[in-house]
Curated annotation (Swiss-Prot):
Residues 18-53, 75-94 are annotated as: Disordered. Belongs to the cyclin family. Cyclin AB subfamily. Induction: Repressed by MYB88 and MYB124 in newly formed guard cells. GO terms for biological process: cell cycle G2/M phase transition; cell division; DNA endoreduplication; guard mother cell differentiation; lateral root formation; mitotic cell cycle phase transition; positive regulation of stomatal complex development; regulation of G2/M transition of mitotic cell cycle. Coiled coil: none annotated. One of its GO terms (molecular function) is cyclin-dependent protein serine/threonine kinase regulator activity. SMART domains: CYCLIN (SM00385), Cyclin_C (SM01332). It is found in: Nucleus. Interacts with CDKA-1. Interacts with SAMBA. Negatively regulates endocycles and acts as a regulator of ploidy levels in endoreduplication. Promotes divisions in the guard cells (GCs) after the guard mother cells (GMC) symmetric division. This is Cyclin-A2-3.
Amino acid sequence: MGKENAVSRPFTRSLASALRASEVTSTTQNQQRVNTKRPALEDTRATGPNKRKKRAVLGEITNVNSNTAILEAKNSKQIKKGRGHGLASTSQLATSVTSEVTDLQSRTDAKVEVASNTAGNLSVSKGTDNTADNCIEIWNSRLPPRPLGRSASTAEKSAVIGSSTVPDIPKFVDIDSDDKDPLLCCLYAPEIHYNLRVSELKRRPLPDFMERIQKDVTQSMRGILVDWLVEVSEEYTLASDTLYLTVYLIDWFLHGNYVQRQQLQLLGITCMLIASKYEEISAPRIEEFCFITDNTYTRDQVLEMENQVLKHFSFQIYTPTPKTFLRRFLRAAQASRLSPSLEVEFLASYLTELTLIDYHFLKFLPSVVAASAVFLAKWTMDQSNHPWNPTLEHYTTYKASDLKASVHALQDLQLNTKGCPLSAIRMKYRQEKYKSVAVLTSPKLLDTLF
């Protein structure tokens, strides 16, 4: 109604001027309204980047350069402070690690030195294992130097090659150069056999335990037991390693325990049972061992004896035997041959097995027995060449002069100069499958060989 009345009024000059004034005023107010809203919009846009700063992770991923500059600008003082502390802690850590490595290396070298310098004058306390870690070194032979195997560093090898003593070392055939057969472990063979040489010095029975400990069991009884066990191993087609380990277990148990003669055969079948479980894929049952004794012993007696033997050994069964070293020494002996000689292998195995019966061979280390068997086997088969060569000397670490006593004792066994009636091993190696090497004899050993 107001607007209609205003329009219907007469249009005069005063009314026209009033209308123009009102339009100017409204336009000014509208512009002021627009100007008052624009700063608010600008403030909103200005605060937009501040809200994006909350998404710090995305900012670091999408704009690495800018964020790096910002971080360097803000944290320069903290970085300088932290850097000093970090260097101090790193140097302390390096010093501690170096000291620990040095201590460990010194302890290891000390253990090896003790093992290599231990002599054979050891005392035995009956029924104890205090001498289990002691070694017998009748031969006063030194421990072989730690080998620089194929895994050794280039610096170590170059140092050895560059030494002045290298030209004086005779050449030998590398028997570990064949990497095709994984069973030979050519990459680790030098280190493995070095550890075996260290292990043979430990847990060795003293060569006079029969006289010192056993009053009811004699050397001849021990020989009869071993001869019978050879027949048992042939009956059940057991591996030769089982037989060697059996004899070792018997000697080590007799070394620390008094045994009556009625229990000697029980000890023998129990040790063969334990060795079979360790070496064989399928070991004979306890009932079978009871059967071969004509049921002289029951199953419970065998189990009780097994418990005693394992407790005496602290369940540490394995030890390197002459058979362990014989395999490697035979490879070294036939390294220069185009085709290996089976006669030499069978004859060396035969001679080594003969030592199991003779109690007096306990004074020789297993590696010495194996090396002597190879020496005598080569001399028996061929007298035109010297049985020892640089390759054998390198891999056995024994010179021919070191083996003189053991080779002569082994030849007496081969020729049976003492007239030993035990013939199980001789009958075994007279078979055609062993090339009848038991019938072979060796000529007299010359002093020039040693």
